[in-house]
Amino acid sequence: MIKSQKEYLERIEYLNTLSHHYYNLDESIVSDAVYDELYQELKAYEEKNPNDIQANSPTQKVGATTTTPFSKNPHLMRMWSLDDVFNQSELQAWLQRILKVYPNASFVCSPKLDGVSLNLLYHHGKLVSATTRGNGLEGELVTNNAKHIANIPHFIAYDGEIEIRGEVIISKEDFEALNKERLEANEPLFANPRNAASGSLRQLDSEITKKRKLQFIPWGVGKHSLNFLSFKECLDFIVSLGFGAIQYLSLNKNHQEIEESYHTLIKEREGFFALLDGMVIVVNELGIQKELGYTQKSPKFACAYKFPALEKHTKIIGVINQVGRSGAITPVALLEPVEIAGAMVNRATLHNYSEIEKKNIMLNDRVVVIRSGDVIPKIIKPLETYRDGSQHKIERPKVCPICSHELLCEEIFTYCQNLNCPARLKESLIHFASKDALNIQGLGDKVIEQLFEEKLIVNALDLYALKLEDLMRLDKFKIKKAQNLLDAIQKSKNPPLWRLINALGIEHIGKGASKTLARYGLNVLEKSEAEFLEMEGFGVEMAHSLVNFYASNQEFIRSLFDLLNPKNSDMAKEKQKSSSVFNNKTIVLTGTLSKPRQEYAQMLENLGAKISSSVSAKTDFLIVGENPGSKLALAKKHGVSVLNEEELLKRLKELD
């Protein structure tokens, strides 16, 4: 709570410093939740003391002034910031201000993506500039980098001048992969997907941007000459131009419907492909929007209904070391319990000891913890201003916490090299039975631990020798449960080849790489390092890991393959793919089809096609359903082959 004008001025200075770090340096000094709390206190003081309001207050401006090597570029129409609401009562108050004057107003609700706002300017159908939000009036010109974002069309079927606005994001999956690469290269990790997206969009080298797998999700328009009556019509028009559709978009009439949409999003939040921090609510009727107008900073016809925070501050009270299936030691921080988005968090990964030293994290530190989707909670950084002298250095272990074998300490990672370490064996089997490997139902972590304790198994081969009486020795196992597990183990025989390769737990070889390897047949693991390097997406580390793993485990691998007899259906699929007319072709689907577009997209991808959301001169086929819209005209302009649904089905049938 701000009690004086002096505290008010200090708060402005502090919040402006935070904004500068957030917008210009891609660095979050405090969590979003802490910033929101400080901002709301500032706003409350200004509401009580309007004569004290300063022009440089963050409530009076959008974003931050840019201070980067990129040139500044003005927006044709201002990019506004949204006012936040944090609970039902605040939302109700916001709605009442609108509905008491416009009782028939409706509201478009959509996910609030946590990324970087970008303004795309098209003139006569051509992308002429891409500018970040900046201070709302002008931002950074990042056109060359934006052109490397795969789902931003360089041309659209609209001749007028139009600003299309949206969010540049990186998916949670791609964010984790990017940070894994940086970790292995001993580079600083990105704190969160938003920082990764911002840093990637603002690279001086566009080739780096191209590699980062950024995505653009549209959410509105700036200057335009469209004649639509509703905001939803505008969004539908943007999608028809070749931009990706907005997931979980809904049109609502009242508070109850908006709350239902909000809670649906919260429910889907963890499984959503990108990081969300709320729901955007916009008055649908453009005439009402115009009459409502703007405050100095925000539109009165829209707000952001924020989600509960996924970042919190807590204290490290201890550190334990876990041993992975490769022998890598992972330090895990024990935390004072803290609730993050409805889940109680009492531990978080510290990645490795090199990362601990780089971030200068100490025992008894107060730290920022983040939890994103299904990702294990992690510590972003220490809050050094809270240090009181009780902190201690977190020391690297010298022996394995499980088998007491001496550890190998490399520059980044620390390893237990004892191949018979129980932790390594146990973790290998947990992975072997996991969903993306052999997916053995009922064979979870606790069951595997019991099997080890009873000395019933040492490796994966032992699973297939288990008998009913063996399982009956385990805690909480009766005849039916034991028989079900035996049946599930037997059912895991004859798996797809890629699943068995993935189940081996080879370092640097995940699900995607396993599928690539499976294309080369049952003897793929016997290939040389040079042959592995010729495979798409395989680097030196992966090739080296494969060769070393096979050399060390030849007998075990052969025995496992003989016992499980994996199916080599991947080879047949590759043969079908190579003979397909759609192999290596870029395809766009548009209009209403009898099956969901995603179903057709999956069929075509299985035949080697690349699915795109926008038509260009590089498009090979346009698949059209009913009401194809502007994409059909654009396809004819570029000489793209057009197939209707009947023709597509005929060609697919010919390939069976």
Swiss-Prot record:
Its EC number is 6.5.1.2. The active site is at 112 (n6-amp-lysine intermediate). One of its GO terms (cellular component) is cytosol. Pfam families: BRCT, DNA_ligase_aden, DNA_ligase_OB. NAD(+) binds at residues 32-36, 81-82, 133, 167, 306. Keywords: DNA damage, DNA repair, DNA replication, Ligase, Magnesium, Manganese, Metal-binding, NAD, Zinc. It catalyses: NAD(+) + (deoxyribonucleotide)n-3'-hydroxyl + 5'-phospho-(deoxyribonucleotide)m = (deoxyribonucleotide)n+m + AMP + beta-nicotinamide D-nucleotide. Residues 577-656 form the BRCT domain. Zn(2+) binds at residues 400, 403, 416, 421. The keyword Metal-binding applies. GO terms for biological process: DNA repair; DNA replication. GO terms for molecular function: DNA binding; DNA ligase (NAD+) activity; metal ion binding. The keyword Acetylation does not apply. It comes from the Bacteria. Its cofactor is Mg(2+); Mn(2+). PROSITE patterns: BRCT, DNA_LIGASE_N1, DNA_LIGASE_N2. Belongs to the NAD-dependent DNA ligase family. LigA subfamily. DNA ligase that catalyzes the formation of phosphodiester linkages between 5'-phosphoryl and 3'-hydroxyl groups in double-stranded DNA using NAD as a coenzyme and as the energy source for the reaction. It is essential for DNA replication and repair of damaged DNA. HAMAP family: DNA_ligase_A (MF_01588). This is DNA ligase. It comes from Helicobacter pylori (strain P12). The lineage of its organism: Bacteria, Pseudomonadati, Campylobacterota, Epsilonproteobacteria, Campylobacterales. The gene is ligA.
